[in-house]
Amino acid sequence: MMKINLFAFSCIVVLYIGCASKNNKLKEDVVPAPVQADKIVSKKSMANAATILLKKEVPILCYHHIRPFSSGISATMKNYSVFPEAFAAQMKALYDSGYHTILPDQLFDYLVYDGPLPEKPVMLTFDDTDEEQFSLGNVEMKKYGFKGIYFIMTISINRPRYMSKEQIKTLSDSGNVIAGHTWDHHMVTKYVAADWEIQLTKPQTLLESITGKPIKYFAYPFGLWNTAAITEIKNRGYKLAFSLSTKRDTTEPLYTIRRILVPGTWTTEGMFKAMKNSFNK
């Protein structure tokens, strides 16, 4: 009986070793399937300046004050002030005409990587931290699902008639973009030495502490810029910088993005006409 059991056990061991050897041979014979070339994800290449300049521009509107003004106000101030009723009419007209607001990340992706945009894109920007941009402008925009970019002059935060830190945080948390606009609105063309730290770095750091998000976009006070400013702005990680209606720089189009001021004298028809005529097709 013992001999029979030993013989059976020996047979089992031989069979196990044979199967294991066969399985190992099968594993060795398996050749991985070749990776198809069209499934290899390649790194996107960035468009050069010439390519960016050829792209159709997105209309970008620039607002400052949203408040009534008297008949005796100067022509200059009329360029920076829009009646609340006029602003409301402009937002409704944009919505009724099929426009969709976009944000700077979308604009950057479109310009640099040929990313998609809605059929009728528009960008709404607000300069200088005025409180009514939050209490009137943002409220009106929310009716239509619109989002905006708020360029914050940090010296004004928490001052009368300007936004508080809490309001800025609320705008950011609700899907709008908070961006840089210097500390005290001095022209970047006049900066020297420590000015770059005071006007660019510290405001960027403060706004990041308020929003909890990177500050990646910037607007030049008065729309004025020079090559030194572009270099300093790029060195601080800004992806786009916005001017006003002057031509884009042929070598740095991402840092000379054009906008048009919306003056208090415009009708909605005038706004649409300016959007059509001010940006390339």
Regions found by a protein language model. Give the residues of each.
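Short beta-strand and adjacent tight-turn residues that come in two discontinuous sequence segments
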Residues: 151, 181, 241-243
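Sec-dependent N-terminal signal peptides
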Residues: 6-14
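Histidine-centered divalent metal-coordination motifs
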Residues: 64, 181, 185
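Acidic (Asp/Glu)-rich catalytic clusters
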Residues: 138-146, 163-180
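C-terminal active-site subregion of NodB/CE4 polysaccharide deacetylases
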Residues: 23-124, 131-132, 190-281
